[in-house]
């Protein structure tokens, strides 16, 4: 389980002088906007795109977006929670029944042979399996956190530094 905390900057507070002529760290006044619990999931590792298809990581439906906008106009994008959790605000369509929500699974897949030694980009595939759901009556949005600690560590070991970019490949359909 991970959490998402959103705060809003209110104002700076003046830095105060400590003994010895050094300054204390800057303080900030912030307002808590929201806090949410996010379920966490393991990230799948496969050696190639072909193995992703063969290892039964089904993709039976597209998602709508990874940049969801709420009723107040606030857009949520994927973010890192520390260096170990990648949080995705995933939106998809489904039948308007609670039991159908349980049918939908989202798997994040890392393909080991996709990066070369000079790569600065880490690529994941998001696979949406709709189960037995056959309708697209309503939008569903969920924040899902994926454990990427081992992948980040392996990337740093292979490339000498952490990635500068994370790309998520997913089938998208807005209709």
Per-region residue spans from a language model:
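First exposed extracellular module after export/assembly in secreted or surface-exposed proteins
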Residues: 1-175
């Amino acid at each position: 389980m991970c959490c998402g905390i959103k705060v809003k900057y209110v104002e700076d507070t003046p830095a105060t002088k400590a003994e010895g002529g050094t300054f204390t760290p800057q303080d900030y006044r912030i307002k808590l906007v929201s806090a949410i619990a996010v379920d966490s999931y393991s990230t799948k590792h496969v050696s190639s795109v072909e193995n992703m298809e063969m290892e039964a990581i089904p993709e039976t439906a597209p998602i709508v977006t990874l940049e969801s906008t709420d009723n107040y106009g606030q857009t949520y994008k994927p973010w890192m929670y520390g260096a170990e959790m990648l949080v995705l605000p995933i939106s998809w369509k489904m039948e308007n029944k609670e039991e159908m929500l349980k049918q939908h699974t989202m798997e994040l897949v890392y393909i080991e042979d996709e990066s070369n030694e000079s790569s600065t980009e880490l690529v994941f595939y998001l696979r949406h399996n709709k189960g037995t759901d056959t309708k697209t009556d309503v939008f569903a949005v969920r924040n899902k956190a994926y454990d990427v600690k081992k992948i980040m560590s392996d990337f740093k070991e292979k490339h000498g530094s952490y990635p500068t970019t994370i790309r998520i490949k997913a089938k998208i359909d807005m209709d």
